[in-house]
Amino acid sequence: HPLFYVVTDFSADMELTTAHIQFIKEHAADDLARLLLSAAKYPGMDIPFLVDQIAARRQIREKLPSWYENGQLIFPTKIAAEQCSSEQTAAYKQELIGESWTVCDLTGGLGIDSYFLSLKAKHLTYIERFPAYCEAAKHNFSVLGANNITVVNADTAQAVDTLPEVDAFYIDPARR
């Protein structure tokens, strides 16, 4: 077994269709418990998944306005949305790296910091141990046009010795 693998395919069960995006917009202010209880009214819709998306979007509305406005972005969990950096904080962190650096984010999470660092970096390697976070990050990076990011699903302690040389490591672990 390899110590890590590069995520190449996005899980189809996490994909947002045009109907999903519209549903999320239409129900953004709804009571989420009631929405879950009325799931039978929406055949063909994965209501638990969509409720999770609405809950996560509520978490990021103020701190990630550009991501909130982009209906194509996926959020793997509400906790990821709670713990992620704000756009303002991520932009500040971006100023701490040099132009054209290669960077490795050892604690990828939702990918906010990775995305902002990638706007300045030559290449960024995003490492995250949770597969769903990796799948969502790969999807979101693609939607955002961040083509200089490699997504790696691995435990950081195992993967770090196998990584190519980089100019900087970034680490901001979950605090829960």
Where are these regions (language model features)?
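SAM-dependent transferase fold signal centered on methyltransferase-like domains
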Residues: 1-176
